[in-house]
């Protein structure tokens, strides 16, 4: 019996059951991934005990020599990974990374161009329920109805009309390659700063499988999980000229002490991402996504924009009797985890939606490849044809579990 099981069996049980879910179910949420044992060991270390307000060499607490080493490793590896002039690894999340950039560049009421959440953007790109939409004047851009890809002509027209101080680029549900150079050209035309939120595609960028935003943007933010496969957290890359202002907007601007155990885990993840194996892994993510997209379409599903260039796809259910909510719940019963998601020009509420978002990073970490993607598409089709048949969904879950047992990940934790 472990120390935790002995002291708090309720929490220990919840952790064990969640470990079983991650081990035996099929995880297809595009924003989730599974970290290595090395990353978890760093995050579960004694560094969780250390306060370290400030930055390496300039702390407000004593005893920071060891955490300075760790943070400098994370910074140097991040800069090497993305070819950036400056990196701040302290943001607790992607949202806080974005907030720090907003506060570095903007004053309340300034105009910002950001991708419409309903078209694949993110809450922090100007949603009225988020700080970004409350503090700043947001002008949303989106995708075309015909291609369901970013309407660069509309972006330029809106930029010329509204003269934004900043253009926010990036998405949380966009399956196509983003043309960062086009955004840079538009921004230069109106004198705007460019902030790219590459949270979803950071791993692909690191591996050279998606164009890098770093040469085209003053600021690049990201989460450190998702395709980057690190701990849950955030990071900001920027040009050296903005480093001092940016750092002060993280601390003391919007955060106090950094989470040094998480920064240690980030450092480990960045080392992993610098390896040749990581590039192979990212290529497999993309290969799996393309294979799954083709297999889903062969099973009769419609995908927004007709496919994918990256790690995710949006299944458009608007022409079926299903909603995203119903599909998510049925797939969950079948041992397949996805999330309901709005599609461009969706007429349903965000709580119901007309689509589901599917991603391949976590399944690829398990070791699944193209042959399994055909099976996965079959499982999804079978489940969504039987949303009201709990017995059938349970039978599909059994097949999913059987497949996943061939690809162990955390089995030592269940011994």
Swiss-Prot record:
UniProt-listed InterPro entries = PyrdxlP-dep_Trfase, PyrdxlP-dep_Trfase_major, PyrdxlP-dep_Trfase_small, Ser_HO-MeTrfase, Ser_HO-MeTrfase-like, Ser_HO-MeTrfase_PLP_BS, SHMT-like_dom
BP GO annotations: glycine biosynthetic process from serine; tetrahydrofolate interconversion
This protein's UniProt keywords? Amino-acid biosynthesis, Cytoplasm, One-carbon metabolism, Pyridoxal phosphate, Transferase
According to the UniProt record, list the residues that bear N6-(pyridoxal phosphate)lysine: 226
Q: Which PANTHER family match?
A: SERINE HYDROXYMETHYLTRANSFERASE
- Which GO molecular function terms does the record list? glycine hydroxymethyltransferase activity; pyridoxal phosphate binding
Q: What is its main location?
A: cytoplasm
What class does this enzyme belong to in the EC scheme?
transferase
Choose one Gene Ontology CC annotation of this protein and give it: cytosol
Subunit and partners: Homodimer.
Q: Which gene encodes it?
A: glyA
Its recorded name reads: Serine hydroxymethyltransferase
Q: Which residues bind (6S)-5,6,7,8-tetrahydrofolate?
A: 117, 121-123, 241, 349-351
Q: What is the species of this protein? A: Geotalea daltonii (strain DSM 22248 / JCM 15807 / FRC-32) (Geobacter daltonii)
Query: Where does the UniProt annotation place the signal sequence?
Result: none
Described by its record, this protein's role is as follows: Catalyzes the reversible interconversion of serine and glycine with tetrahydrofolate (THF) serving as the one-carbon carrier. This reaction serves as the major source of one-carbon groups required for the biosynthesis of purines, thymidylate, methionine, and other important biomolecules. Also exhibits THF-independent aldolase activity toward beta-hydroxyamino acids, producing glycine and aldehydes, via a retro-aldol mechanism.
| Family per record | Belongs to the SHMT family.
Site note Plays an important role in substrate specificity applies to 225
E.C. code: 2.1.2.1
Pathway this chain belongs to: One-carbon metabolism; tetrahydrofolate interconversion; Amino-acid biosynthesis; glycine biosynthesis; glycine from L-serine: step 1/1
């Amino acid at each position: 019996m472990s120390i935790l099981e002995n002291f708090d069996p309720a929490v220990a049980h919840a952790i064990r059951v969640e470990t079983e879910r991650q081990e035996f179910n099929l995880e297809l949420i595009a924003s989730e991934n599974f970290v290595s044992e090395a990353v978890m060991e760093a995050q579960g270390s004694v560094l969780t005990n250390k306060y370290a307000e400030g930055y390496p060499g300039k702390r407000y607490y004593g005893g920071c020599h060891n955490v300075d080493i760790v943070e400098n490793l994370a910074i140097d590896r991040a800069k090497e990974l993305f070819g950036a002039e400056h990196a701040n690894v302290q943001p607790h999340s992607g949202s806080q990374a974005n907030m720090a950039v907003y506060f570095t560049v903007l004053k309340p009421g300034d105009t910002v161009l950001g991708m419409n959440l309903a078209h694949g953007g993110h809450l922090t790109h100007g949603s009225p329920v988020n700080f970004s939409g409350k503090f700043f004047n947001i002008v949303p851009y989106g995708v075309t109805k015909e291609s369901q890809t970013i309407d660069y002509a509309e972006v330029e027209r809106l930029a010329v009309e509204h003269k934004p101080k900043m253009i926010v680029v990036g998405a949380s549900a966009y399956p196509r390659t983003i043309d960062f150079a086009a955004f840079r050209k538009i921004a230069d035309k109106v004198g705007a700063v460019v902030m790219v939120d590459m949270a979803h595609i950071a791993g692909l960028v690191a591996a050279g499988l998606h164009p890098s935003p770093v040469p085209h943007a003053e600021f690049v933010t990201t989460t450190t999980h998702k395709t980057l496969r690190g701990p849950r957290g955030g990071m900001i890359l920027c040009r050296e000229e903005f480093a001092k202002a940016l750092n002060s907007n993280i601390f003391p601007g919007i955060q106090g002490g950094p989470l040094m155990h998480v920064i240690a885990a980030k450092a480990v993840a960045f080392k992993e991402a610098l390896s040749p194996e990581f590039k192979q892994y990212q290529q497999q993510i993309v290969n799996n996504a393309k294979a799954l997209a083709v297999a889903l379409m062969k099973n009769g599903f419609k995908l927004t924009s007709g496919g994918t260039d990256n790690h995710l796809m949006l299944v458009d259910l608007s022409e079926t009797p299903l909603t995203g909510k119903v599909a998510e719940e049925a797939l969950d019963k079948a041992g397949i985890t996805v999330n309901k998601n709005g599609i461009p020009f969706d007429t349903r509420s965000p709580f119901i939606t007309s689509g589901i978002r599917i991603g391949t990073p976590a399944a690829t970490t398990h070791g699944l490849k193209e042959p399994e993607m055909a099976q996965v598409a079959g499982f999804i089709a079978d489940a969504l044809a039987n949303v009201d048949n709990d017995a059938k969904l349970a039978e599909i879950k059994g097949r999913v579990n059987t497949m996943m047992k061939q690809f162990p990940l955390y089995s030592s934790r269940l011994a």
